[in-house]
Swiss-Prot record:
Record key words, sorted: Acetylation, Cell membrane, Cytoplasm, Disease variant, Endoplasmic reticulum, Hydrolase, Iron, Isomerase, Leber congenital amaurosis, Lipid metabolism, Lipoprotein, Membrane, Metal-binding, Microsome, Palmitate, Phosphoprotein, Retinitis pigmentosa, Sensory transduction, Vision
Modified residues annotated as N-acetylserine in this record: 2
Top-level lineage group: Eukaryota
Record-linked InterPro entries: Carotenoid_Oase
Species of origin: Homo sapiens (Human)
Cofactor(s) the protein requires to work: Fe(2+)
Stated family: Belongs to the carotenoid oxygenase family.
Catalytic activities: an all-trans-retinyl ester + H2O = 11-cis-retinol + a fatty acid + H(+); lutein = (3R,3'S)-zeaxanthin; all-trans-retinyl hexadecanoate + H2O = 11-cis-retinol + hexadecanoate + H(+)
Record carries keyword Transmembrane helix: no
Positions contributing to Fe cation binding: 180, 241, 313, 527
Residues that bear Phosphothreonine: 101, 105
Entry protein name: Retinoid isomerohydrolase
Length: 533
């Protein structure tokens, strides 16, 4: 998996080009044979509009949200896409300029207003974006597109029409929520977001949304906070993108990438700033791992620590004989990886892309093992007694537990990211296989499968082809964990190729089963799901 491929033609730049939405679905040209059991829709979110008029967006997470759908029926495939009608998008289209500040792009007051109107507009408070470009997930019978703020957007998964905006603050105490909730098999949704806790200090709340009940009321209206995690810094919450969940425990990893709330509230309101301006790194903090008892709704005061890293995606978490196994896609060090995801960097020529990536934190897939039963008499000892891991947990004299990981995969500037597993059957349980998007100096150029027990890897890769996050779909009669297919949207700007296609791989060995080609470009997508018919 560590074989490095070069991209001198710069075809990856097509990932960051504005496209138009479609008025109706396109029929894709299929080569190979799509399994007849594969019936349903692949839904994906990402940016599709990278500028408004003459005003560009600057960061990868700024472009306006585009919702994509590949429909599978009786071996045929259609492709559809529509922009999500968020407030950010509608107002930008109406005023023909960027109206709401995005992750790395500031919105400025209407230049047509006089100086007094512009001055007072800064004191209206922080106007938070609802640009739902990151993920889509189910709540009850409904589907929501989301970013990482308090706003989520209800969409119609059949027509891709936007239905309404929902403010989570109207139901629970969170300032925002991640785009990676956990969905249990009964439909229960868990998520995490920071909040103001006791004495106005910052904390992190776990939100639970129940499954749809017999009364058919919106489950979001029945949301509740089930447990609260403390924050290591009273006024500077860590950036959190995902978390771990097992049948009995919740795992939260607190990294040194911090949000400076004073800067967020003051500079944003007074003279204009964006989200990226408000991040800073605590160079001395390292990483703290927190756990809570899910069933008893209780925070457990075990103090797990380790050396600094960035974290965006948990792979899986499970229980094993008194231990929690936590598998993560890490980036070494305390510097924020998002500093390297400005569009200007990603659109550079290949040699410059590599040069920039060499300065960034380096990726590594790691396994941490957290002992649940701590005996103070074991100070100085390794508490990990499992026979199948090299990870350690040393009980220190200050009663903290210092963790060292087992490395599952590591390659220089070769990341295994956007991980997926056989989620429905193995989330929170012992598992063997993970699927990931391979990033080559931040350029997505391969799909990977990792055996987390043996560290064996499989790779799909073709020249001038730029895939997306792999989505695993289990065979309806599966007998083994990896019985099924992997779906990925591939951008293919090379000569003699269609601009983009939906790739279907055998999940066993990543051999190609089929592809469904379309005659139009598809920009980068981040996350999504397969909705079975």
């Amino acid at each position: 998996m560590s074989i490095q491929v070069e991209h001198p033609a710069g075809g990856y730049k097509k990932l960051f080009e504005t496209v138009e939405e479609l008025s109706s679905p396109l029929t894709a040209h299929v080569t190979g044979r799509i399994p007849l059991w594969l019936t349903g829709s692949l839904l994906r979110c990402g940016p599709g509009l990278f500028e408004v008029g003459s005003e560009p967006f600057y960061h990868l997470f700024d472009g306006q949200a585009l919702l994509h759908k590949f429909d599978f029926k009786e071996g045929h495939v259609t492709y559809h896409r529509r922009f999500i009608r968020t407030d950010a998008y509608v107002r930008a289209m109406t005023e023909k300029r960027i109206v709401i500040t995005e992750f790395g792009t500031c919105a400025f007051p209407d230049p047509c207003k006089n100086i007094f109107s512009r001055f007072f507009s800064y004191f209206r408070g922080v106007e938070v974006t609802d640009n739902a470009l990151v993920n889509v997930y189910p709540v009850g019978e409904d589907y929501y597109a989301c970013t990482e703020t308090n706003f989520i957007t209800k969409i119609n998964p059949e027509t891709l029409e936007t239905i309404k905006q929902v403010d989570l603050c109207n139901y629970v105490s969170v300032n925002g929520a991640t785009a990676h909730p956990h969905i249990e098999n009964d439909g229960t949704v868990y998520n995490i977001g920071n909040c103001f806790g006791k004495n106005f200090s910052i904390a992190y709340n776990i939100v639970k949304i129940p499954p749809l009940q017999a009364d058919k009321e919106d489950p979001i209206s029945k949301s509740e906070i089930v447990v609260q995690f403390p924050c290591s810094d009273r006024f500077k919450p860590s950036y959190v993108h995902s978390f771990g969940l097992t049948p009995n425990y919740i795992v939260f990893v607190e990294t040194p990438v911090k949000i400076n709330l004073f800067k967020f509230l003051s500079s944003w309101s007074l003279w204009g700033a964006n989200y990226m301006d408000c991040f800073e790194s605590n160079e001395t903090m390292g990483v703290w791992l927190h756990i809570a008892d899910k069933k008893r709704k209780k925070y457990l005061n075990n103090k797990y620590r380790t050396s600094p890293f960035n974290l965006f995606h948990h792979i899986n978490t499970y229980e094993d004989n008194g231990f929690l196994i936590v598998d993560l896609c890490c980036w070494k060090g305390f510097e924020f990886v998002y500093n390297y995801l400005y569009l200007a960097n990603l659109r550079e020529n290949w040699e410059e892309v590599k040069k920039n990536a060499r300065k960034a934190p380096q990726p590594e897939v790691r396994r941490y093992v957290l002992p649940l039963n701590i005996d103070k008499a074991d100070t100085g000892k390794n508490l990990v007694t499992l026979p199948n891991t090299t990870a350690t947990a040393i009980l220190c004299s200050d009663e903290t537990i210092w963790l060292e990981p087992e490395v599952l995969f590591s390659g220089p500037r070769q990341a295994f990211e956007f991980p997926q597993i056989n989620y429905q059957k193995y989330c929170g349980k012992p598992y063997t296989y993970a699927y990931g998007l391979g990033l080559n100096h931040f350029v997505p150029d391969r799909l990977c499968k990792l055996n987390v027990k043996t560290k064996e890897t499989w790779v799909w890769q073709e020249p001038d082809s730029y895939p997306s996050e792999p989505i695993f779909v289990s065979h309806p009669d599966a007998l083994e964990e990896d019985d099924g297919v992997v779906l990925s949207v591939v951008v293919s700007p090379g000569a003699g190729q269609k601009p983009a296609y939906l790739l279907i791989l055998n999940a066993k060995d990543l051999s190609e089963v089929a592809r469904a080609e379309v005659e139009i470009n598809i920009p980068v997508t981040f996350h999504g799901l397969f909705k079975k018919s």
